[in-house]
């Protein structure tokens, strides 16, 4: 009974979290630096978003820093 309740709480939390995540993950990130070059930090991405004019990137904490900034 307790395990069943805990399972239902976890499932409900996962559903609520998935509904709260924005559908458009291509929103502008925050400022980051690739050496002396200023870029835009994208969390949990392995590549820069396409169609935004980025010409380079560097790995950044749990994401990527893409430059140049427009």
From Swiss-Prot:
> What is the purpose of this protein?
Potently and selectively inhibits voltage-gated potassium channels Kv11/KCNH/ERG. Acts as a gating-modifier toxin that shifts the voltage-dependence of ERG activation in the positive direction and suppresses its current amplitudes elicited by strong depolarizing pulses that maximally activate the channels.
Give one GO molecular function term. Answer: potassium channel regulator activity
Q: Which organism is it from?
A: Anthopleura elegantissima (Green aggregating anemone)
Q: Where in the cell is it found?
A: Secreted; Nematocyst
Q: Which residues does the record annotate as propeptide?
A: 22-26
- Family per similarity comment: Belongs to the sea anemone type 3 (BDS) potassium channel toxin family.
**Signal peptide start-end:** 1-21
Cystine pairings recorded for this chain: 32-65, 34-58, 48-66
State the remark under miscellaneous.
Shows significant expression differences between stressed and unstressed A.elegantissima.
Q: Which UniProt keywords apply?
A: Cleavage on pair of basic residues, Disulfide bond, Ion channel impairing toxin, Nematocyst, Neurotoxin, Potassium channel impairing toxin, Secreted, Signal, Toxin, Voltage-gated potassium channel impairing toxin
Where does it mainly reside? secreted
This one is known as: U-actitoxin-Ael2c
Checking SUPFAM superfamilies in the record gives: Defensin-like
Q: Name one Pfam family in it.
A: Defensin_4
Show the GO cellular component annotation of the record.
extracellular region; nematocyst
